[in-house]
């Protein structure tokens, strides 16, 4: 068995989000040896640039510009193409923000702690970057892995028509009927966006009102705006199972009328986010988490 290659650095950053890339660039500018580990080259720059703020607002703007006569599928495809072109440019800018420093090493792969200041990096599934295991030790290690969608344990939630806020940005085909599970900011943003793109949208909230973290008068006003746009909102509703079929996915527990379950062409599950630390081996670094 071949021993893994080793690297040493002054600073090791796990994850290319805003805080990590800024710190890495600053340390590299002062001549420090920096290693940046990112599991996917598609995430150079972090969530905001690649799958969060910028791409979603690009799609929101495109949806707002759609005219009534525009074909939803064709218009959505053009909007996604424009989104991807912009994100590709920003991703490349962020790559060079670090790669152009002589003291920075960029590693594509998945990191896991093997000691307090040492990680093992393995090739990401399907990745084209790292081809062998790598051990990296550093004086300072920064965990900058961000968050990921928190999906509830509901039967059928791994079905082909079930999406997160990331995958729905490239959904194919365009959903004539979209169900949104969760009535927080992300779910409602996508609900309004896809309604503007031309989908029939139903929002399903487990609680008795939308935007539970906001003041009640704010939530009431937002609900009125969404319903005026033609969005159906079901509160006090929980989906117990997703059943995929030839006509779409049936959401058992959500009333679609006449006593039958609601059926959708695509489902967005927007039920919150959690720290993306499950596979980091934090216990090996002596890090305790709740």
List each language-model region with its residue ranges:
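Glycine-rich dinucleotide-binding loop and its adjacent helix/turn
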Residues: 53, 145-200, 283-290
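A Rossmann-like FAD-binding core segment of flavoenzymes
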Residues: 105-108, 112-128, 197-290
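N-terminal Rossmann-like dinucleotide/flavin-binding domain of flavoprotein oxidoreductases
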Residues: 2-9, 47-138, 214-240
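Residue-level detector of alpha-helix initiation sites
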Residues: 17-22, 43, 48, 148-149, ...
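N-terminal Rossmann-like FAD-binding beta1-loop-alpha1 element of flavoenzymes
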Residues: 9-36, 187-195
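Glycine-rich FAD pyrophosphate-binding loop
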Residues: 28-47, 199-210
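Beta1/beta-strand and adjacent pyrophosphate-binding region of the FAD-binding site
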Residues: 3-17, 174-184
């Amino acid at each position: 068995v071949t021993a893994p290659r080793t690297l040493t650095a002054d600073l090791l950053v796990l994850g290319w989000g805003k805080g990590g890339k800024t710190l890495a660039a600053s340390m590299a500018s002062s001549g420090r040896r920096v290693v940046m580990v990112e599991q996917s080259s598609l995430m150079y720059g972090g969530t905001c640039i690649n799958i969060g703020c910028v791409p979603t607002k690009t799609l929101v703007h495109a949806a707002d510009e759609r005219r009534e006569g525009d074909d939803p599928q064709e218009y959505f495809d053009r909007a996604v193409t424009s989104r991807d072109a912009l994100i590709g440019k920003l991703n490349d800018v962020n790559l060079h923000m670090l790669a152009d420093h002589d003291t920075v090493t960029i590693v594509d792969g998945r990191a896991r702690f093997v000691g307090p200041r040492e990680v093992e990096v393995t090739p990401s599934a399907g990745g084209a970057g790292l081809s062998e295991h790598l051990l990296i030790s550093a004086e300072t290690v920064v965990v900058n892995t961000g968050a990921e969608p928190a999906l509830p344990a509901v039967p059928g939630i791994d079905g082909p028509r079930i999406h997160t806020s990331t995958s729905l940005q490239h959904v194919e085909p365009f959903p004539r009927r979209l169900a949104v599970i969760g009535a927080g900011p992300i779910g409602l943003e996508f609900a309004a966006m896809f309604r503007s793109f031309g989908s029939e949208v139903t929002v399903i909230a487990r609680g008795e009102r939308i935007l539970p973290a906001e003041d009640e008068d704010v939530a009431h006003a937002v609900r009125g705006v969404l319903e005026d746009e033609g969005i159906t909102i079901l509160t006090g509703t929980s989906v117990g199972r997703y059943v995929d079929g030839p006509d779409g996915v049936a959401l058992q527990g959500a009333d679609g009328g006449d006593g039958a379950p609601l059926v959708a062409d695509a489902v967005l599950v927007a039920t919150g986010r959690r720290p993306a630390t499950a596979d980091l081996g934090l216990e090996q670094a002596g890090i305790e988490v709740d």
